[in-house]
Design a protein with these regions (language model features):
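Helix-loop-helix hairpin linking two adjacent transmembrane segments in secondary transporters
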Residues: 155-206
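C-terminal membrane-cytosol helix-exit motif in multi-pass small-molecule transporters
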Residues: 96, 188-221, 417-425
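Extracytoplasmic gate region of multi-pass secondary transporters
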Residues: 33-38, 246-298
Length: 430
């Protein structure tokens, strides 16, 4: 009745679909440079550390912009911010495509001096990655508390599969259409994502009623009647302040830094690892990266659902323990087949912990969900920018062992997070 009377746009399912599709296209920028890193590195004369920075640079804006844009959901519902981020990504990709048209990228040394320009445009293209915190907060507001793990799993799980798909598809596009045309195709695909979100994306009911001119109290009552259970406590700044005062927010940030930042980092880094570290051809390197990335993305769904049943804390601890072991195993000589199997163990750990972490945000920070999703999604995803240059630096220090040493970073962080979460969340809860 209320939904019809006020012409409420969307339902929980359609809003989740719109957010998931928008994020799906936006987050593919994680793999923007990974599959082409060898070619771009030769064109610009880059070392391993610089390559690590190149493949991770879309994650810089893709992570940090999550904080303000995620918090703004608590002020305006997020649709406007989502559209802005996708539009910026389209512009960045289009500019990169034009740059690659002007310079013969596949000629070694042809782009010397243009490294800062490519980094800058990579940052702009990475804005689409930042849609995560916007859509995550929208999903939390649209769905009942009992189904937020499911919604977060669908959104984060299906949404992030595009990074793995692109890791496999980009080498195929390069082979079939050439370097420049492949990036123009990516620009068109990102534009499609923008158009789909314009069509399907919708603010949660409370914000729609506010926009229709209802008072905050009336909007809240109407939204309750439509099934919305979570409500913001104030402005974006208020939401950030409230969530920042809750210690568990920062525990979840570190947790997400390790596994979602890790997911972003390895999706970008694995093509380099398989090609330069293991000597595999680009097609196979892309395929192995795609399997790793898509599996990690899809496992967020059962990770979220399992967290609904047994608690996100238990799921997270088990996943982190698996990650700690797998990081050590990546240093054992066993050929690319054995290392690929271990990479799938890392994928399982990432997927389940990412699903569990986002389920825990409304559990521990219900007073400022948008702000918390901004902190967790932003600083958490910042790991995607931090890890690849560190892993590249280790390769520069030891070309023989450095590729394996990089995975010990994940072992260290997994153990650290387990200790912090045990004392900061599990013991306090009981």
């Amino acid at each position: 009745m209320i939904q019809s009377q006020f012409k409420l746009k969307g339902t929980p399912s359609s809003a989740l679909l719109g957010a998931t599709l928008g994020f799906f296209f936006g987050v593919m920028a994680i793999s923007l440079f990974g599959p082409t890193s060898t070619t771009l590195g030769a064109a610009m004369g880059l070392g391993a550390t610089e390559l690590g920075l190149l493949v991770s640079v879309p994650s810089l804006t893709g992570s940090l912009l999550r904080i303000p844009f995620g918090a703004m959901v608590d002020s305006n519902g997020g649709r406007r911010g989502f559209l802005f981020l996708l539009a910026a990504a389209v512009i960045g990709l289009g500019a990169l495509s034009l740059l690659f048209t002007l310079y013969p990228v596949e000629t070694p040394g042809s782009m010397k001096g243009l490294y800062p320009v490519v980094l800058l445009l990579g940052c702009l293209a990475g804005c689409g990655i930042a849609t995560f915190s916007v859509g995550a907060s929208q999903s939390n507001y649209w769905f009942a508390k009992s189904r937020q793990g499911y919604a977060s799993g669908i959104y984060g799980g299906l949404g992030t599969t595009s990074a793995g798909i692109l890791a496999f598809a980009l080498p195929l596009l390069l082979h079939r259409f050439g370097f420049t045309a492949a990036y123009y195709i990516l620009t068109g695909v990102m534009l499609l994502g923008l158009l789909l979100y314009i069509w399907l994306g919708a603010n949660p009911p409370y914000f729609q009623f506010l926009k229709a001119g209802k008072s905050a109290d009336v909007a809240r009552d109407n939204a309750l009647a439509c099934g919305q259970e979570l409500f913001p406590k104030g402005s974006a700044a208020t939401s950030l302040k409230i969530s920042a005062r809750i210690p568990q927010t920062w525990m979840l940030v570190l947790c997400y830094f390790t596994t979602f930042g890790g997911f972003m980092a390895l999706t970008a880094w694995f093509p380099t690892f398989w090609k330069k570290g293991m000597g595999l051809d680009p097609m196979l390197a892309g395929a192995l990266t795609a399997v790793f990335s898509i599996l990690a993305a899809l496992l967020r769904v059962p990770g979220g659902k399992l967290s609904d049943r047994i608690g996100g804390e238990k799921v997270s601890m088990a996943a982190l323990a698996l990650l700690a072991v797998a990081g050590v195993l990546m240093n054992i000589p066993m050929g690319w087949g054995g290392l690929f199997f271990v990479s799938l163990l890392i994928s399982v750990a990432f997927g389940f912990n990412n699903g569990a972490t986002m389920k825990l945000v409304p559990v521990y920070v219900s007073e400022g969900v948008g702000g918390a999703n901004g902190w967790v999604g932003g600083f958490g995803a910042f790991g995607g920018f931090v890890f690849p240059p560190l892993m590249g630096r280790l390769v520069d220090l030891s070309p023989e062992h450095g590729y394996g040493w990089g995975f010990l970073l994940f072992t260290f962080f997994a153990l650290l997070v387990m200790v912090i979460n045990y004392f900061g969340m599990m013991r306090k809860k009981h």
